[in-house]
């Protein structure tokens, strides 16, 4: 079985202009997992575990509802509940940070859902906060190779980010490159610009300990 899951070596940029200007850039990696490949991927990689401790671990309880149902089932149920027609064998691709040595740090995850013809159907941006709360935002409007959504935030993220702002999501469909932007607006004024961009690498044991 040829696996399509991959790792992205990413550059994260965050630039806030209000209430006080602050900017940082740092490098991270993100896993891009076809959820149908999760079990064979863990068999292929010595340092990745599914619902068990390892150097890197993927726990279903960390995604969407805090229960141990399969993440794919939770994704499909969520989009159906929100008006998207989906069949059980649709593909779900998840871009996320795994647990590292059991520690959870995952500010945002991105889900991309594909139909039987591998055409993108919708995306979900799941935003987390410092209290380990999570809120999903469903993106169904596609502009070219991107899903777009501007929506009232209605979610506490940090002391520097008020509840009455808008999120503006722009999620490019993952391929050889990852290109994701999340901005915040106060009316017409953009007060936060953030992006995650990176290049795809193969999943190997060597890459996981590099």
Task: State where each predicted segment sits.
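Mature, function-bearing regions of proteins
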Residues: 1-210
């Amino acid at each position: 079985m040829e696996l399509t899951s991959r790792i992205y070596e990413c550059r994260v940029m965050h630039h806030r202009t209000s209430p006080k200007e602050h900017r940082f850039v740092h490098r991270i990696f993100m896993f891009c997992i076809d959820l149908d490949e999760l079990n064979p991927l863990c068999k292929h990689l010595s340092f990745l575990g599914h619902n068990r401790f390892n150097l890197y671990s993927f726990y279903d309880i960390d995604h969407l509802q805090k229960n141990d149902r399969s993440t794919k089932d939770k994704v499909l149920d969520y989009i159906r509940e929100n008006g998207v027609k989906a069949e059980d064998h649709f593909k779900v691709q998840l871009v996320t940070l795994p647990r590292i040595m059991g520690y959870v740090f995952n500010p945002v995850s991105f889900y991309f859902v594909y139909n039987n013809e591998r055409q993108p159907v919708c995306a979900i941006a799941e935003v987390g906060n410092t209290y380990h709360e999570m809120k999903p935002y469903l993106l169904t409007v596609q502009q070219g190779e991107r899903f777009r959504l501007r929506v009232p935030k209605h979610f506490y993220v940090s002391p520097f980010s008020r509840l009455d702002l808008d999120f503006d999501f722009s999620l490019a469909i993952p391929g050889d490159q990852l290109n994701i932007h999340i901005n915040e607006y106060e009316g017409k004024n953009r007060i936060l610009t953030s992006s995650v961009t990176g290049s795809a690498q193969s999943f190997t044991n060597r890459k996981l300990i590099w």
